[in-house]
């Protein structure tokens, strides 16, 4: 019990230090996701990375409307729901509190093995966040590489103790081997789960519904049934609870005791642990629902002349959505009290690698924040409502795209296809940086395209040439169908139906997953 109490006190202290700036020293006025919880959520999300080859095949048919609700998750959850002993696992590699790797298991290799192949001796002094407790085969190599800390999600481990296909004896022997490796290594193998700060879940729910992607749907299709977002969220919650939680409390206690967490099996530690896990799953489901697989919406080329040319070069919609959710999670680390923005950069190599992400590999990520090392009172925090332009924040905030480029862990290679996913349209300050860095594709919302605000403008994005732009919109082919059947108008270059009399549309209800 003493160990459990010390762990909670330690993590509470860490939570207090990591809820703010890039240096973790500021306390803001809005709820913020701690870095530990961000890394944990990203590890869970990486476990759900779409199977690349299957998605490329499915992308050719993704407009036929054959999938049920949340059809984009069928392939993502196939491996996790399959009754196999080795569970698919997501992994986040962190060095100096910066993400340097996002990985997931492949058909041939575990996540820990992939990390060794990709990073090698560079894993020394890194922190690793697993979506499941790693097996002994992975742990021995990771420990040998000199990692600093290994954190894992305290549910069913990588060698499953729950599935019918697992050999109970083999799984327990592996768990014992893991404990022996843990007790005899210098690496700290632990559970890092922090309670969410006050009102965090409520804040995420409100901002997810108001985000550009959901609002674009409601603006483009004004006759939409607005319950679609909440229905999507409920489906995601059910799905993720089945994947990442152990519904039976006694079974959960048995797993915890088997994997060396018997000190967490007594209340209040056990009930607190389960509540923290449920809260994080709710948050993940909420954010994932903000970029939904809905009707014919997705990331498409805005220029009709380039649609046929660029289609074969674009990512499958499921992968594009997955990467955008990564950026949405990053946005909850923002230091901007008004607008949180997240950005993540990926690249695609010439050939498929051993990673579960296929040929794609992580390059860098960021969120909008004040300069590294700054304190809360060092810079102004006022927005354009402040008449005195000298004390506004816009001259001091580092944009998400800028942080992603600055702290990238890989070089951007001109011969490879690189892509950046941004939760909002890149502004005029960032567009030339993205092009100059050699990034080939931009995935973003287009709600602000062509707008000029008090302190920031979005004029260059629409005029940008030499970089493929895929914005969140109704599939242009579907928009063309609307053009043939209904009056239309254009909003940011996208066909939009003109609202008709309410009685003409009262029977039209949008359905989830028809994509």
From Swiss-Prot:
MF GO annotations: cytidine deaminase activity; dCMP deaminase activity; importin-alpha family protein binding; protein homodimerization activity; zinc ion binding
Motif placement: Bipartite nuclear localization signal: 489-511
Catalytic residues, chain numbering: 401
Record: residues binding Zn(2+) 1: 110, 135, 138
Domain of life per record: Eukaryota
EC class of the enzyme, as a word: hydrolase
Listed InterPro entries: APOBEC/CMP_deaminase_Zn-bd (IPR016192), CMP_dCMP_dom (IPR002125), Cytidine_deaminase-like (IPR016193), dCMP_deaminase-rel (IPR015517), Deoxycytidylate_deaminase_dom (IPR035105)
Homology family: Belongs to the cytidine and deoxycytidylate deaminase family.
Name of the featured protein: Cytidine and dCMP deaminase domain-containing protein 1
Gene (name only): CDADC1
């Amino acid at each position: 019990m003493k160990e459990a109490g010390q762990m909670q006190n330690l993590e509470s202290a860490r939570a207090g230090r990591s809820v703010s700036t890039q240096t973790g020293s500021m306390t803001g006025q809005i709820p913020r996701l701690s870095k530990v919880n961000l890394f944990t959520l990203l590890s869970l999300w990486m476990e759900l990375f779409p199977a690349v080859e299957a998605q490329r095949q499915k992308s050719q048919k993704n407009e036929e409307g054959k999938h049920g609700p949340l059809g984009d998750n069928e392939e993502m959850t196939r491996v996790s729901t399959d009754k196999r002993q080795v569970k698919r696992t997501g992994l986040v590699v962190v060095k100096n509190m910066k993400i340097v790797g996002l990985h997931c298991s492949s058909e041939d290799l575990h996540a820990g093995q992939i990390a060794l192949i990709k990073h090698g001796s560079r894993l020394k002094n890194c922190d690793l966040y697993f979506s499941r407790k790693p097996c002994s085969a992975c742990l021995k190599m990771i420990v040998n590489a000199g990692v600093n800390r290994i954190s894992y999600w305290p549910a069913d481990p990588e060698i499953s103790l729950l599935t019918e296909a697992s050999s109970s004896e083999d799984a327990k022997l592996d768990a014992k081997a893991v404990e022996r490796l843990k007790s005899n290594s210098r690496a700290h193998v632990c559970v890092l789960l922090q309670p969410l700060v006050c009102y965090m879940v409520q804040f995420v729910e409100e901002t997810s519904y108001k985000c550009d992607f959901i609002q674009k749907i409601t603006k483009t299709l004004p006759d939409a049934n607005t319950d679609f977002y909440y229905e999507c969220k409920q489906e995601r919650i059910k799905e993720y609870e089945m994947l990442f939680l152990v519904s039976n409390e006694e079974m959960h206690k048995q797993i915890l005791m088997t994997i060396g967490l018997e000190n967490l099996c007594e209340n209040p530690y056990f009930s607190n642990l389960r509540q923290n896990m449920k809260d994080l799953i709710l948050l993940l489901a909420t954010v994932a629902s903000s970029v939904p697989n809905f009707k014919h919406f997705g990331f498409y080329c805005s220029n009709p002349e380039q649609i046929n040319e660029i289609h074969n070069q674009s990512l499958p919609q499921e992968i594009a959505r997955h990467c955008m959710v990564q950026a949405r999670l990053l946005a909850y680390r923002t230091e901007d009290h008004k607008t949180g923005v997240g950005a993540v950069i990926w690249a695609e190599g010439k050939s498929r690698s051993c990673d579960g992400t296929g040929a794609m590999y992580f390059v860098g990520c960021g969120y909008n924040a004040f300069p590294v090392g700054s304190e809360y009172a060092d810079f102004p925090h006022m927005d354009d409502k402040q008449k005195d332009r000298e004390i506004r924040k816009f001259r001091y905030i580092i944009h998400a795209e800028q942080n992603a480029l600055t702290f990238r862990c890989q070089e951007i290679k001109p011969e490879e296809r690189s892509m950046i996913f941004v939760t909002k349209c890149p502004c005029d300050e960032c567009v030339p940086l993205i092009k100059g860095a050699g990034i080939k594709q931009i995935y973003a919302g287009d709600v602000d395209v062509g707008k000029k605000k008090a302190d920031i403008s979005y004029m260059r994005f629409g005029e940008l040439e030499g970089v493929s732009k895929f914005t969140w919109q109704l599939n242009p082919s579907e928009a063309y169908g609307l053009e043939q059947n209904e009056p239309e108008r254009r909003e940011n270059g996208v066909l939009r139906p003109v609202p008709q009399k309410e009685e003409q549309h009262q029977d039209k209800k949008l359905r989830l997953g028809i994509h």
